[in-house]
Amino acid sequence: MTIDRNALGFGVGERAIFAADPWNSRGRLYPEGGSLTRSDFQRDRDRIVHTTAFRRLKHKTQVFIGPDSDHYRTRLTHTIEVAQIARALARAFRIDEDLAEGVALVHDFGHTPFGHTGEDALHELLEPYGGFDHNAQSLRIVTKLERRYAEFDGLNLTWETLEGLVKHNGPLMNADGEGTRGPVPLPITEYCQMQDLDIASHASLEAQAAAVADDIAYNTHDIDDGLRSGYLTFDMLEDVPFLAGLMRDVRDRYPNLEADRFTHEIMRRQITRMVEDVIAVAQERLARIRPMSADDIRQAGETVITFSEGMAETDRQIKKLLFSKIYRHPDIMRIRAGAAQIVTDLFKAYMADPTLMRSDYWVEHTAGLETPAKARHVGDFLAGMTDTYAVRVHRQLFDHTPDLR
């Protein structure tokens, strides 16, 4: 595929006709007056950045739990990298950069301590009460659990930002009302009774940009961290033809490059090639669909900003490599088992005696609740923990805490 550079925005020219319009938003659940200095989507982004949930991302890990180095990525550094790629894509298509950035910044709010390990453990514990889904938890955080404003709980974000948060990976329901990826999580269906997020349609282009940016950042930077940790080697990367080609390109241009610089040159090329692939695909689909509004994107029946078939296959190959060499490595599996034990122990302890949680949280949120509601609030409390806080509290409550090093 080729890219029409003349059609790209890069901050120049008018907003695309299919961009989300910050001056004509579908509004907020609780009506507010506008700002003289910022658009609605700018205000959303700023509210997201100033939350407790955003600050906590600094101490939540993705893959390398309790690493010995300060250079491994956390949820916060990953989120910033996703936002940068999402904003670059939005600029290329002349769509709203602030909305794309806002969705990218908020997309990981609902993640538990200890990455997907913590989420899997918490989902199993909460399964009798509806389960746990980090995307739905993100919605709970920004619509209920963040308590900063005098007139409402949550952040009172615009419809477009909430839609992007919930649907950035695609529609949640099909035309028959069935979940596209299993049952729609309860927090999402409950919220949609107050403000319909149209979960059977696709999301805006801005949200789609955030979603593919997440994939690009996730794979690229897990390779980087894997090489730093020693779980990956350059020889292992040769198993993926796309990565092998990037390494040949770097070696041909810089024959004697030291390892750290060599790694960086591979990573920057990987991001560039993936972004270029996404842009080429989106240009072709936009030319075919000819959308005249943001709603035309939502009703297009397909994802517009996505990988080509070839790059999607590369994405699968990279994920397979990461799973076999990193995520399923015996050292990582041992640490994951310990992390899951910490989450399980804390959940059971709080369910047996909720007063073990912070007293103000217990009095305000959990006292007197029946078991299903109590379990949901215990889940909220646990999901909001950072890795370090969960380990510290476990040490206070139990005689033995798993070693996560």
Swiss-Prot record:
Keywords: Hydrolase
CDD domains: HDc (cd00077)
Cited Gene3D superfamilies: Hypothetical protein af1432 (1.10.3210.10)
InterPro entries linked to this entry: dGTPase, dGTPase-like, dNTPase_2, HD/PDEase_dom, HD_domain, PHydrolase_assoc_dom
Keyword Hydrolase: yes
SMART domains: HDc
One GO process term, biological-process aspect: dGTP catabolic process
Top-level taxon: Bacteria
SUPFAM superfamilies reported for this sequence: HD-domain/PDEase-like (SSF109604)
GO molecular function, one term: dGTPase activity
Ranges for domain HD: 75-219
Record family assignment: Belongs to the dGTPase family. Type 2 subfamily.
Name of this protein: Deoxyguanosinetriphosphate triphosphohydrolase-like protein
UniProt organism field: Allorhizobium ampelinum (strain ATCC BAA-846 / DSM 112012 / S4)
Lineage, highest ranks first: Bacteria, Pseudomonadati, Pseudomonadota, Alphaproteobacteria, Hyphomicrobiales
